[in-house]
C-alpha cells in the first residue's frame, strides 16, 4: 500500500527521475569531482578555527550575508551597479532561476554534453529542456544553437564557460551571438574561470539579460557550498523572492570571508593546478590509443579505444584511484573518461594505474 500511495501523490515526472548519485571514494585517491587537491597550512587552519570559535551558532546568520558580499564583490571585481545573490552552491542558484521562470510551455536551452544539473533541475520543475549537441570535437554548433533559440524562445539559456565535462572554452564571439539572440535570461556559468583566465563579468553592463555564475568550490572551498550569481539588479531582486531565508549558514559565511582575506593563496593554488594540467595532458598524449581533449578547467577529458572505457575505469579504480566514467552517458561521451588534476603524487598514481590498466 505504501508504494501505491507514493505513486499516487508524487508527481509522475519526479518518479521518472533518478536521484543524483555520488561514487563512494573511501580509501581511494579522489580525482572524480573536480575538487581542488590542496588544503591550507596548519597555521592558516589554526587561524581559521580561531575565527570560527567566535561564531554564535545559536543565532541565525545574516540573511543577506552583507559582509561576505562586500568581500566577494572585491574579489570578483563586480561592477558597482550590478547586484549579487548567493546560493548554497551553484545548484541552488540554478534551482532559484528555474523556479522563478517556470511556467506552462516554458523551455530551457543548453549545449550538450554539459553540466547535468541544468537538465535535472529543469525536469524537476516541469520545464521543457532542449539540449543542442556539440560538434564531434566538442566545439559549439553555433548555427544549431541559434536555430533552437529562435524556435523554442527559451526562458533561460545556460552556457558553461569553460564547459563541463568537456573542459573546453567556447569563443567569446559565439557566446556574444547567443546572448544577442536570446529573448530571456542567459546564464554564463564560470565555475572553472579561475583556470581559464576568461570571464564575461565586464560584459554584465552591456547586456541586461546576462547573469554570470561563479562558485568557490573549484578554488579549494567545495565543502562550504557557496555559489554566486551576478547581474542586473532587476533580475536579482526577483530571484531574492524565491531564495529561502538564511540559506548561507554562519560557518560558511565566516569561513568564506576568511579565505578571501588570503587571495594570494587561492591564486597560487590555481596557478599550480594549471601547471599540473599541462604536464598531465602531455603525459596522456604520449599513451597510444588515448585521445586527449583540450582543457581550460581543472580536469581533463580523454577518450579510450572503442568499448574499453568501462574496463579501463575499473582497472584504475582497482589500483586505488577514482576518476569519472562518462561513457555510460552515451552520445559524444561514449568511450570517454574524465580525470581531475590533482597533486603531483596523485597525478603520478593515476598515470601509473592507467598504464597498468590498459595492459590488462
From Swiss-Prot:
Tell me what reaction this enzyme catalyses: L-histidinol phosphate + 2-oxoglutarate = 3-(imidazol-4-yl)-2-oxopropyl phosphate + L-glutamate
- CDD domains the record matches: AAT_like
Task: State whether keyword Transferase applies.
Answer: yes
Check the record and name the Gene3D superfamilies matching this protein. Answer: Aspartate Aminotransferase, domain 1, Type I PLP-dependent aspartate aminotransferase-like (Major domain)
Which pathway? Amino-acid biosynthesis; L-histidine biosynthesis; L-histidine from 5-phospho-alpha-D-ribose 1-diphosphate: step 7/9
EC class, as a word, reads transferase
Give the protein's cofactors. Answer: pyridoxal 5'-phosphate
The record lists its disulfide bonds as none
Q: Which SUPFAM superfamilies match?
A: PLP-dependent transferases
Chain positions with N6-(pyridoxal phosphate)lysine modification: 218
Annotated keywords: Amino-acid biosynthesis, Aminotransferase, Histidine biosynthesis, Pyridoxal phosphate, Transferase
Which GO molecular function entries does the Swiss-Prot or TrEMBL record give? histidinol-phosphate transaminase activity; pyridoxal phosphate binding
**UniProt-listed InterPro entries:** Aminotransferase_I/II_large (IPR004839), HisP_aminotrans (IPR005861), PyrdxlP-dep_Trfase (IPR015424), PyrdxlP-dep_Trfase_major (IPR015421), PyrdxlP-dep_Trfase_small (IPR015422)
Q: Which GO terms describe its biological process?
A: L-histidine biosynthetic process
Pfam families given in the database record: Aminotran_1_2
State its Enzyme Commission number(s). 2.6.1.9
Please verify whether the record's keywords include DNA-binding.
Answer: no
Matching NCBIfam families, A to Z? hisC
Family statement drawn from the similarity comment of this UniProt entry: Belongs to the class-II pyridoxal-phosphate-dependent aminotransferase family. Histidinol-phosphate aminotransferase subfamily.
Quaternary state and interactors: Homodimer.
HAMAP family reported in the protein's UniProt record: HisC_aminotrans_2 (MF_01023)
The name this protein goes by in its record: Histidinol-phosphate aminotransferase 2
Native source species = Nitrosococcus oceani (strain ATCC 19707 / BCRC 17464 / JCM 30415 / NCIMB 11848 / C-107)
Which lineage ranks, top first, belong to the organism behind this chain? Bacteria, Pseudomonadati, Pseudomonadota, Gammaproteobacteria, Chromatiales
Q: Which gene encodes it?
A: hisC2
